[in-house]
Amino acid sequence: MQTPSKGKLFLVVGPSGSGKGTAIVQLKKRHPDYVFPVSCTTRAPRLGEKEGEVYSYISKEQFRAWIEEGRFLEWAEVHKDNYYGILKAPIEEALAAGKVVIREVDIQGYKKVISTLPREDVVGIFILVKDLEELKKRILKRGFIPEDEMARRMESAQKEISQMDVCNYQIESPFGHIEKVVQSIEDIIQKETA
């Protein structure tokens, strides 16, 4: 695909279990020329996670200092325990270099980003699973989740779905058809960067 003269940031949004993470993994394999910025977090690495692949692990003190310095494009404190955020500089540099930048965010993160960057630089793609029972099954396939956590995720999914129209595009994610989701994202990128 052709690189645009000025880059674009494609934010992939959707509830837990929608397939957005799996789609991004596939896009990374298929498009090594795209930029996939990592998030910073204060949580400890989980088993199998490596520094710099999905997250950069930093201390709460460092994270708070970077908030004060205005280094984050968007950030959030999750469960009053850990911070997560996306640094501005790598994204701004990639956009200035004409790169396609892809990042997964939640709906609140998307809203923060579109209030910060020029709107024409950002494209929102919402990955939708219409059936919440299907969504629940997908989440449970990953492993056991306590009932209260599942209830929280389902409530969050309903809230995100109710706000999906703030994104430029909505893609349906049928079970077992991640290739269709990836192809739809590629088609959107092609259209938006032509």
Where in the sequence are the language-model features?
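NTP-dependent small-molecule kinase module
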Residues: T3-P4, L140, F144-I145, K159-A194
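P-loop (Walker A) phosphate-binding loop of NTP-binding proteins
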Residues: V13-P15
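ATP-binding Walker
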Residues: S18
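Walker A/P-loop
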Residues: G21
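Post-Walker A helix-loop "phosphate-sensing" segment adjacent to the P-loop in P-loop NTPases
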Residues: K29-P37
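ATP-dependent small-molecule kinase phosphotransfer cores
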Residues: T41-V101, I107
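Conserved phosphate-donor/acceptor-positioning beta-strand/loop module used by diverse small-molecule
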Residues: V101-I107, L117-K141
